[in-house]
Curated annotation (Swiss-Prot):
Superkingdom as given in the UniProt entry: Bacteria
Keyword Lipid metabolism: yes
Family: Belongs to the AcpH family.
EC top class, as a word: hydrolase
Keyword set, alphabetical order: Fatty acid biosynthesis, Fatty acid metabolism, Hydrolase, Lipid biosynthesis, Lipid metabolism
Native organism: Shigella dysenteriae serotype 1 (strain Sd197)
Function, as annotated: Converts holo-ACP to apo-ACP by hydrolytic cleavage of the phosphopantetheine prosthetic group from ACP.
Entries under Pfam families matching the protein: ACP_PD (PF04336)
Catalytic activity: holo-[ACP] + H2O = apo-[ACP] + (R)-4'-phosphopantetheine + H(+)
Cysteines engaged in disulfide bonds, as pairs: none
GO molecular function, one term: [acyl-carrier-protein] phosphodiesterase activity
BP GO terms, sorted: fatty acid biosynthetic process
Name used for this protein in its record: Putative acyl carrier protein phosphodiesterase
EC number: 3.1.4.14
Length: 143
C-alpha cells in the first residue's frame, strides 16, 4: 500500500546496494515500528493494547480456514505481542533476522537493519509526512 508513495520511494534510495532489493520489506516493518511507537498520538481514543485484542478477535474468526503457515505465524504474533513489541528497535532487528532465517533468498534483511539505524531520524520524518495523508485516503476510500 505504501510502496508507491514519494516518501517511501525516496527512503528506498537510502539503502545500500546490497540491501536495496529487500528495502520494501524492511520499510514495511519500520513503518509498523513507528506506528507502534507513536500509537498514542495517532489513535488516542483506542489504546494499542485494546486494538491488539480487537484485531486478534477479528483474525481468529478466519484462522480455522487459513493455511498452516498463517496459523503458525498468528500463534507467535498474538502470544508474543508483536504489535506492541514493534516499538522496540531490538525487536525489529529480531524480526528481520527471523525473516531472513526462514527465507534464504531474503538474507539481505539481516543487513538492512544497518540502513534503518543509519537513517532512523529521516525515516521517522518520512513516516510523519505520509501517514496522515495515507489515512485520509483510506477514509475517503481512495487508496
Amino acid at each position: 500500500m505504501t510502496d508507491n508513495l514519494p516518501e517511501v520511494r525516496e527512503a528506498r534510495e537510502w539503502f545500500r546496494s546490497e540491501t536495496r532489493r529487500v528495502a520494501p520489506i524492511t520499510l514495511d516493518v519500520m513503518w509498523d515500528h513507528f506506528l507502534s511507537r507513536h500509537w498514542s498520538q495517532l489513535s488516542p481514543d483506542f489504546p494499542l493494547q485494546e486494538f491488539v485484542c480487537y484485531a486478534r478477535e477479528q483474525v481468529m474468526t478466519i484462522l480455522p480456514d487459513s493455511l498452516p503457515r498463517f496459523i503458525n505465524l498468528n500463534n507467535y504474533l498474538w502470544s508474543e505481542q508483536w504489535l506492541v513489541r514493534y516499538r522496540d528497535m531490538d525487536f525489529i532487528q529480531n524480526v528481520l533476522n527471523g525473516m531472513a532465517s526462514r527465507r534464504p533468498r531474503l538474507d539481505a534483511l539481516r543487513d538492512s537493519w544497518y540502513d534503518l539505524n543509519a537513517h532512523y531520524a529521516a525515516l521517522e520524518t518520512r513516516f510523519w509526512q505520509f501517514y496522515p495523508r495515507m489515512m485520509a485516503q483510506v477514509s475517503r476510500k481512495a487508496l
